[in-house]
A protein has these predicted regions:
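N-terminal active-site segment of His-dependent metallophosphoesterases
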Residues: 1-41
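Divalent metal-coordination and catalytic microenvironments
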Residues: 22, 27, 42, 56-57, ...
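Cytochrome P450 core scaffold surrounding the K-helix E-X-X-R motif
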Residues: 122-128
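Active-site neighborhood of divalent metal-dependent phosphoester bond hydrolases
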Residues: 31-110, 134-142
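Conserved beta-sheet core of the metallophosphoesterase superfamily
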Residues: 129-196
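Active-site-proximal beta-strand elements of phosphoester/diester hydrolases
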Residues: 1, 112-118, 168-170
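Short, well-ordered beta-strand micro-motif
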Residues: 108, 114-116, 184-188
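Active-site environment of divalent metal-dependent phosphoester hydrolases
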Residues: 2-6, 30-32, 59-63, 121-122, ...
Length: 198
């Protein structure tokens, strides 16, 4: 959410190896002061490491502002801060249009599914509605899913990482609340995990 200093704080605490994969969970923009700087930084990281960039609810709204509903969301949930960081609405797409248009809805590995908001537990992964992938909350969080993978997600903020047997949420409200931390989750090959906070 435009919080470049918090992003830099988290990245500075991670010892990276060339074969590490960074999965960015979406909501790079809106609310915070430097949406453009955040996107520049994660694109730059992709020049030295494999990076997966997922779409968040805020990027989804940005890409659909031709629809009145999503224009309302953009205007009322931090979009003006993004416009300020780029200088104009048009500049958002001049500078980073390809980045926003190529964001992925999820990233699947043998052990994990990374997705911004979650999945609808009533449907298999290949039949998910893209709106659910970026906006779903309670139906996903408080239900068991049928996938063999553990689901790593954000979108719904908690005071600390939310962990149950099938999912982990790393959204701590960064960008929404001034004192909230940005949280990263390191998933090691041996199955251990650690959290890093700004």
């Amino acid at each position: 959410h435009g919080e470049l200093k918090k992003l830099e704080s988290v990245l500075s605490q991670i010892d990276t190896r060339p074969d590490d994969v960074f999965v960015f969970m979406g909501d790079y923009i809106d609310r915070g002061p430097d949406s453009r700087g955040v996107v520049d930084r994660i694109i730059a990281l992709g020049e030295t490491n494999k990076c997966i960039y997922l779409i968040g609810s805020h990027e989804y709204a940005l890409l659909h502002t031709n629809d009145e509903y999503y224009q309302f969301l953009f205007d009322n949930y931090g979009g003006p801060a993004t416009v300020r960081s780029y200088g104009s609405f048009e500049n958002i797409f001049k500078v980073h249009g390809d980045f926003y248009r190529n964001l992925k809805f999820y990233y699947l590995t043998d052990k994990y599914l990374f997705v911004h908001a979650g999945i609808n537990p009533d449907y298999p992964l290949e039949e998910q509605d893209e709106v659910d992938l970026v906006y779903i909350r309670g139906k996903f969080i408080y239900s068991k899913h049928k996938l063999p993978q553990k689901i790593i997600f954000g979108h719904t903020e908690f005071d600390e990482p939310y962990i149950d047997e099938g999912k982990i949420c790393i959204d701590l409200g960064c960008g929404k609340y001034p004192d909230a931390h940005l949280c990263a989750l390191i998933l090691n090959e041996d199955g251990t995990r650690e959290f890093v906070y700004s």
